[in-house]
UniProtKB/Swiss-Prot annotation:
Lineage: Bacteria, Pseudomonadati, Pseudomonadota, Alphaproteobacteria, Rickettsiales
Gene3D superfamilies attached to this UniProt entry: Ribosomal protein L25, beta domain, Ribosomal Protein L25, Chain P
Official protein name in the record: Large ribosomal subunit protein bL25
Gene Ontology biological process terms, A to Z: translation
InterPro entries: Rbsml_bL25/Gln-tRNA_synth_N (IPR020056), Ribosomal_bL25/Gln-tRNA_synth (IPR011035), Ribosomal_bL25_b-dom (IPR020057), Ribosomal_bL25_C (IPR037121), Ribosomal_bL25_long (IPR001021), Ribosomal_L25_dom (IPR029751), Ribosomal_uL5_bac-type (IPR020930)
Region (Disordered) residue spans: 184-208
Gene name tied to this protein: rplY
Taxonomic superkingdom: Bacteria
Biased composition (Low complexity): 187-208
Membership in a protein family: Belongs to the bacterial ribosomal protein bL25 family. CTC subfamily.
């Protein structure tokens, strides 16, 4: 595990919980939060609104290990949920999960599609169809991926890229409901689709 994969934040323990104390924290520029996990008692904490927002905007926190410094103690966690105000969109509460470095975790990772302009099928007028923009994976905390790259350069019309085509580390397992799902396809050219649609419309009219 390298420093590049860890986001560090400061946190403080909450002495009081509930609606009233949480409102007071928010008025004072803090965000109420909780850390939970198997075989661990929930930990009620609060974060600096300013610090959390700066980290939240600069990194995909959902795919980073977070080192929470709570007083003199450090806890490694994952961010699992953020609650926002329905009107102001201000962050109201954050849920974290304790991490056991020897236990695999499940996490959703974004797919990054590269070389679309070099894609053989797109150059020939094909239509790019992206079916999945994220993947659910299982791995140890030190093997978390911030993103997964999907290279479109050699994708031709009528062909697809599946999960099995990805070059994933051996310690990462994809956990999706569908076995070996299709991630992206290249369908026929736009003109072909327009022609096909026109022919279908004509046939329907003649049957009427």
């Amino acid at each position: 595990m390298t420093d590049q994969t860890i986001v560090k934040m400061n946190a403080e323990l909450r002495n009081s919980v509930g609606t009233g104390p949480s409102r007071t924290l928010r008025r004072n520029g803090a965000i109420p939060a909780v850390v939970y996990g198997k075989h661990r008692s929930p930990l009620s904490i609060y974060l600096s609104d300013r610090e959390f927002l700066s980290k939240y905007r600069s990194a995909a926190l959902s795919t980073h290990l977070i080192e929470l410094e709570i007083g003199e103690k450090k806890e490694y966690v994952l961010m699992r949920d953020i609650q926002k105000h329905p009107v102001t969109d201000r962050i109201q509460h954050v849920d974290f999960q304790f991490i056991d470095h020897g236990t695999e975790i499940k996490i959703e990772v974004p797919l990054v599609f590269v070389n679309e302009q070099r894609c053989v099928g797109v150059k020939k007028g094909g239509v790019l169809n992206i079916l999945h923009r994220t993947l659910h994976i299982k791995c140890l905390p030190n093997a978390i991926l911030q993103s997964i790259e999907v290279d479109l350069a050699n994708l031709t019309i009528g062909h697809s890229i599946h999960v099995s085509d990805l070059n994933l580390p051996s310690e990462v397992t994809v956990v999706m409901k569908e076995h070996n799902p299709t991630l992206v396809t290249i369908s026929g050219t736009s003109s072909d689709q327009d022609t096909s649609g026109g022919e279908s419309s004509g046939t329907t009219t003649s049957e009427d």
